[in-house]
């Protein structure tokens, strides 16, 4: 579960390393976001000469959470970190690569491009 002020790792090659959630999109009083939800982030750490800079505000989709997610068959899946992938205005990924595993729930949330770029889908 991601809420405002949560720090996340950026799991793509846009150049950002660490981001902070500043808004959970989808309702005025919505507090938490889970895998497949869109949030607004601010980049806190970035590598030099990259497409995103420190202080950039952009939208992102959550691909991994430390909080477990229950699936229909009764199994639970959780990850070691909270991670997101930066999106452009058309809600497609800005980077060309996605690092680390991503959850299968992204397929249900219609982020097929992120799923196809990922090296592993769990």
Curated annotation (Swiss-Prot):
Subunit structure, interactors included: Part of the 50S ribosomal subunit. Forms a cluster with proteins L3 and L19. In the 70S ribosome, L14 and L19 interact and together make contacts with the 16S rRNA in bridges B5 and B8.
Name of the protein: Large ribosomal subunit protein uL14
GO cellular component, one term: cytosolic large ribosomal subunit
Keywords: Ribonucleoprotein, Ribosomal protein, RNA-binding, rRNA-binding
GO biological process, one term: translation
Function according to Swiss-Prot or TrEMBL: Binds to 23S rRNA. Forms part of two intersubunit bridges in the 70S ribosome.
SMART domains (UniProt xref): Ribosomal_L14
Molecular function terms from GO: large ribosomal subunit rRNA binding; structural constituent of ribosome
Organism: Borreliella afzelii (strain PKo)
Family the UniProt entry places it in: Belongs to the universal ribosomal protein uL14 family.
């Amino acid at each position: 579960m991601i809420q405002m002020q949560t720090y996340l790792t950026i799991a793509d090659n846009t150049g950002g390393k660490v981001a902070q959630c500043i808004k959970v999109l989808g309702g005025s009083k919505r507090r938490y976001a889970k895998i497949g939800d869109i949030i607004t982030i601010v980049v806190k750490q970035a590598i030099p000469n990259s497409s995103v800079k420190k202080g950039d505000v952009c939208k992102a989709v959550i691909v991994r959470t430390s909080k477990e997610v229950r699936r229909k068959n009764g199994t639970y899946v959780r990850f070691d970190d909270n991670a997101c992938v930066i999106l452009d205005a058309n809600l497609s990924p800005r980077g060309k690569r996605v690092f680390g595993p991503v959850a299968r729930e992204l397929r249900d949330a219609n982020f097929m491009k992120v799923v196809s770029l990922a090296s592993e889908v769990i």
